[in-house]
Structure formats: structure tokens, C-alpha cells
Amino acid sequence: MDAKTVQVTIDKAVPRWDIFCAVVDNFGDIGVCWRLARQLAAEYNLSVRLWVDQLAPFRALCPTLQECDQQWLEGVDVRHWQGENCTPETSDGAADVVVEGFACNLPAAYIEAMAAREQAPIWFNLEYLTAEPWADEYHSLPSIDAQTGLQKVLFVPGFSAHTGGILRERDVIERRDQWQSHSTYRSLFLKQLNVQCDHNTRLVSLFSYENSALPELLRAMEQFSQKHCVLVPMGRVVASIESYLGESLPLGQAITRGALTVQAIPFLAQAEYDHLLWSCDFNIVRGEDSLVRALWAGKPLLWHIYPQEGEHLIKLQAFLTRYTEGLTPEQAAAVTALWMAWNTQASMVEPWQQALAELPALSRQARSWALLQSGKTDLAAKMVQFCTKLV
């Protein structure tokens, strides 16, 4: 049946949620909103609509997405948000809970529909993830919309008990452990990607913004004593790799220089990207969504934070302070030096070598850190709990 004609009966007794997402940086915003929408529908049996302004980036994460105004995917009512087309007529009235993803500015007509409700909706302004101390103070603070008098609640994802938590499906750790405890899953997955590497090769995933430090990182791997195989989902960083190699890197092709092999793989849907992270020995990730997934993978990682005129380094250091807890001063210094060099586009050779010298300890720490975080209440649960307390 065509997605345009799918009809689903909505139980009016089930709370309705609307999540709005304006795609700013290709995949990060929609990645978070799509995960949140799916989790709310699957784990809490909620009626969820996801409004997205750009379908092309969304389709990269969810290949079954079609080019149409409305469709149902994995229990979520997905709507193409086209400017002010989201009116009371097209949205069947404002929902009980409205999530404004990353201050994306809701359509004026929709806000009017919110104000016209007999019972005001719960209105969340979902912020970006941060480990900065201010998150503890500002999370869940209300503000009043000047035009309508509606209350909007700032919801700040974070790593402490006083923040909004981070996205985590209930079974993600269980699924990860099952995958990593059976080498067959990894072997079959890599075979599907046409990746060939022996057990002595360090497998690295690379999903990054453009970075002038990348050539030095590749050079460090090329000259290292142990072989490295770098798997690169097709995207923005491939051109930089081709410049370093001095030749094109077609999809599926592997090119070897010294101890370094680089292979371009397809851009993966979210579930497959999890499998990539679970399969690799070291993960280089970018933005918010892939960072969180790399954390749940329980493998050593390097994060390329979204650049913001210097402010991102404050955010990066705040996360490093939390992430390196439990490491020795030498181990923490190695992680910090590597991450700072990568995010300031500085020399990478020595930081990479120092980090690899501590890799066994970093592997244990990554695993234990994921376990520690999995014991905390996740973002979707905290949102639902917040709403339940107000009913």
C-alpha cells in the first residue's frame, strides 16, 4: 500500500505528541528527533507525529522514507513540514505534548491552535546535549510565550541526574552485548560491506566534519606498527581523504598506504550504523546523535564536536571532564590531548600515538562508562515522567 494512502485509527485516549524538526546540519537534528519519536511510540505506546522540513537527509537515515506529505514509519506518523503548511486543518489540531526540536520555531498557525485548546499543551523546547554545569540549573525551567501566554519548558539533555538525560532505548545495551559476544554477527556485517581485514588489523570508523587535521591522523595510522583499516561512510569527509591519497575513493574500494587501509562504505541507516560502531575497535564520530550511539557502543572514541566559533571547545572540555572520570591522570591527559588536537585541527601524530598506548585502559573505561550511564533515566523516560506529573 502506498504511504500516501495508509489509514491508521488513532485512539483519542492515548496522549498525542508532535515533534518538530528543522534540519540544520544534515543528520544530527533529525537523527535525534527520529530516535525520540520511535522510542516514544514503541516503548510508551504514544501517538507521535514527527514534522520534518527536509526529507532528503531523513531518507539517508531511514531509506524506506518516501517523498510525500504524510506516511507511517515504525509506528510514527511522519509529516513533511513545509513552512506554514502546518495549520489546524492539516495537523488535526495541536497535540497534547509539543516538542520544539532545537528551537526550530513552530509555525504561527500551529501556535494559535495550541493557544486555542481548552487544556494548554505541554510545550518542550528540546535543547542540544551538553555536559556543561549550567544544564543542571536550567533544565526544566519554564518560560512564557509573549504572544499566547503559553508556558514553554526548556528540556536540556545531559549526563547528570539533574538534566534531561540522553537517548537510550531500553534494550540497546542488551542488543549490543549480544552482537559483540558473537563474532559471527560482526563477520557477516563486514562481509556485506565487502570489508576484508584480519584479526590483527585495528578497525576504525570515521564519520567526521571536514578537518584539516585529518591528513596527519591518516599519516599517523599509515606509519604505525599495527595495521589500521578505516571505514568511511560516504559523505563530507571523503574529498579530504581523496586529497590525502592522491586518488579517488569510489564506494566499496579499499586503498592501502603502508599500514593504513581506507575503504568507503555506504552511508548507513541508524540501525546499521549502530552495528558499525559495535564492530569497530575505535570510533571517530561527529555531532550529537553519533556521539551518543558511540557511547553506547562501549568502544574508545574520538568526537568531532560541531564548531561554533570557539564556544564548542568549552562544551568539549565539559564533556571530557565527565568522560575521563575514573582514568588515571596520564590516561585522561592522553584522551584530552587527542580530542583537543582533533577539534582545534592541530598536529595529530603524537596525540594519536599516546592514545593508542593507553588503548586497553580506554577500552575498559568506555565499556564501564556506558554501563554507568545506562543505569540513569533516559531522555524519553524523563519527558514522559515530566508529563505524567502534570496530569
Which sequence ranges carry the predicted segments?
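A donor-sugar binding/catalytic signature common to diverse glycosyltransferases
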Residues: 27, 34-38, 267-315
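Donor-nucleotide binding loops and adjacent catalytic segments primarily
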Residues: 196-274
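Extreme N-terminal starter segment of soluble prokaryotic enzymes
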Residues: 13-18
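A nucleotide-sugar donor-handling region in carbohydrate enzymes
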Residues: 127-215
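C-terminal amphipathic helix plus adjacent low-complexity
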Residues: 325-391
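A short helix->loop->beta-strand "cap" motif at the edges of active sites that frequently abuts
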Residues: 118-122, 226, 299
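Short, glycine-rich nucleotide/cofactor-binding loops
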Residues: 19-30, 207-211, 282
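Active-site and donor-binding regions of nucleotide-sugar-utilizing enzymes
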Residues: 21-45, 49-149, 235
